């Protein structure tokens, strides 16, 4: 794309923003939702507006989500989180008196498609604002495109170091930096009494920018505590048959197992192999998958196989935050299920909307340059995941790391030990099917 063409597109986008701002003032309301099911397809729909916003131009927010492909489960959860936020912001008066409309395009979990999608959302659809996609894998390429157009890029699932290694000033992750995810778990194992502490541990992780950065610090903590790492393997992200890897882990009889997973199928495959191999580690944590509620339980054969399994994160359905509990209740009312079915993806997406709304309201503007400057100002904002304060890179330095464990069909906060809301860790992990 030529420089002159890019300037023309930016001018067009600014003109669209100006048109909306011309009518902006107080608060109004509407509800909105949108969905897309195929790569490159886009659908946007608005709910009924209240009398105060019914005749006002909507503010359109674009995003690319993985509604199919490898990240479909997470992408669909993100879509629900964005929709819940849009419904709530519109019910509360919209943004600057205008209803919000979501413009969602499916990227089919493809790094190349996500680039095409954000280019379309900004240069063709002229959406005034954009939200981030799911995963660091898709955040890295899309952030470069969004930066080229001068847009703020607030996201909730691109917390790996790779997302912040390009010197971009427009990217902001509302969630916990993934590099800290496994620290509470590693510290807990390392500080167990010597008679209870595992003597061996196995590590297997996908070659993914989300999973790999979580392990170096955790492994070092375990080794410093005298825990021997008897298996440490990085497997290709393209792997679909995990049986050989899981069998190799089981053969070590390691007393603790740390899995770098990005989805439910990965964890499910390991668990089913472990059951077949009669391998039951005293402690088992997976970086993603166990946080997926009903989808996880169904994939592994029910709650009895989930008992004692752990997952790191910065949020869970029982998080003691009034806004979080309201969101969980709204999710259950709209989509059914129980609070345990509301996974962290929903909260991450909802938080993105909250932070963007606070920035828009604080700056009284849809000017992306003003929003970027505000988010870099050191202000502390609030979300359903807790406080948000961005450092110079755009990472959330106020986020806290926790670990959660499935106990009696409920995902409970258990780490850090002694933290508000933490329950006793179930250790050793019960046998599969117990």
What are these regions (language model features)?
Residues 4, 25, 73-80, 92-165, ...:
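Beta-alpha junction/loop-to-helix N-cap segments that form part of ligand/metal-binding clefts
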Residues 51-83, 105-112, 134-135, 204-213, ...:
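Extracytoplasmic "Venus flytrap"
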Residues 1-22:
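Sec-dependent bacterial lipoprotein signal peptides
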Residues 21-35:
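Bacterial lipoprotein signal-peptidase II cleavage site
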Residues 274-350, 361, 417-422, 428-433:
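Extracellular/periplasmic periplasmic-binding protein-like sensory domains
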Residues 80-102, 194-196, 223-226:
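Signal peptide-proximal N-terminal region
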Residues 334-346, 357-414:
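Segments of small-molecule ligand-sensing domains
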Residues 126-232, 284-308:
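Extracytoplasmic ligand/sensor domains, especially the bilobed periplasmic-binding protein
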């Amino acid at each position: 794309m030529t420089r002159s063409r890019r300037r023309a597109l930016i001018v067009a986008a600014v003109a669209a923003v100006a048109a909306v701002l011309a009518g902006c003032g107080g608060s109004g309301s509407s509800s909105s939702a949108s969905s897309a099911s195929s790569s490159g397809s886009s659908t946007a729909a608005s709910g009924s507006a209240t009398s105060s916003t019914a005749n006002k131009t909507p503010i359109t927010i674009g995003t690319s989500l993985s509604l199919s492909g490898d990240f479909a489960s997470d992408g669909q959860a993100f879509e629900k989180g964005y929709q819940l936020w849009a419904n709530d912001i519109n019910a509360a008066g919209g943004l600057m008196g205008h209803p919000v409309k979501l413009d969602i395009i499916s990227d089919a979990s493809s790094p190349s498609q996500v680039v095409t999608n954000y280019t379309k959302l900004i240069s063709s659809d002229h959406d005034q604002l954009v939200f981030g996609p799911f995963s660091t894998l898709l955040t890295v390429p899309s952030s470069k495109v969004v930066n080229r157009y001068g847009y703020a890029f607030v996201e909730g699932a691109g917390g790996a170091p790779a997302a912040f290694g390009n010197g971009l000033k427009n990217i902001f992750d509302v969630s916990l930096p993934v590099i800290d995810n496994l620290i509470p778990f590693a510290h807990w194992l390392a500080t167990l009494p010597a008679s209870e502490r595992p003597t061996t541990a196995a590590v297997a992780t996908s070659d993914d920018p989300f999973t790999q950065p979580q392990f170096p610090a955790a492994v070092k903590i375990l080794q410093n505590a005298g825990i021997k790492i008897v298996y440490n393997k990085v497997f290709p992200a393209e792997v679909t048959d995990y049986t050989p890897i899981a069998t190799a882990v089981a053969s070590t009889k390691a007393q603790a197992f740390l899995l770098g997973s990005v989805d439910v199928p990965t964890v499910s495959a390991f668990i089913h192999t472990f059951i077949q191999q009669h391998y039951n580690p005293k402690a088992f944590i997976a970086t993603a998958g166990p946080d997926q509620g009903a989808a996880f339980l169904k994939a592994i054969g029910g709650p009895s196989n989930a008992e004692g399994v752990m997952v790191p994160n910065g949020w869970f359905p029982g998080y003691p935050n009034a806004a979080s509990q309201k969101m969980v209740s709204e999710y259950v009312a709209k989509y059914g299920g129980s609070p345990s079915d509301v996974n962290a993806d929903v909260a991450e997406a909802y938080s993105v909307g909250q932070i963007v709304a606070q920035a828009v309201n604080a700056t009284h503007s849809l000017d992306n340059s003003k929003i970027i400057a505000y988010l870099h100002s050191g202000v502390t904002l609030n979300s359903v995941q807790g406080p948000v304060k961005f450092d110079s890179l755009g990472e959330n330095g106020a986020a806290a790391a926790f670990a959660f464990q499935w106990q009696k069909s409920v995902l409970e906060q258990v780490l850090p030990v002694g933290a508000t809301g933490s329950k006793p860790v179930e250790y050793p992990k019960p046998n599969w099917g117990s």
